[in-house]
């Protein structure tokens, strides 16, 4: 599996997006990813919305290919945000420092 960083741009109002993210459906979505029921898995997300950046949501994904991320998100989520995955390597700066 490869790592992909995605800076999603919101297509809907940030308040609407926040409501969706707090819904019970997101808990089920997270469980499905954790149990390997989806082709890709969101490992971490960073939410800048509470801090004034109301047009982006950032995620680190694990997937075999970038298309698996769109498949995992599904059409409903893709109406709410963009998905342009960028394959990345992780640098663990603590390991570099210990080096």
Task: List each language-model region with its residue ranges.
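Short S/T/G/P-rich N-terminal loop/turn motif that feeds into the first structured element of a domain
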Residues: 1-56, 64-71, 89-99
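Conserved short beta-strand edge segments in small beta-sheet-based binding/regulatory domains
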Residues: 79-92
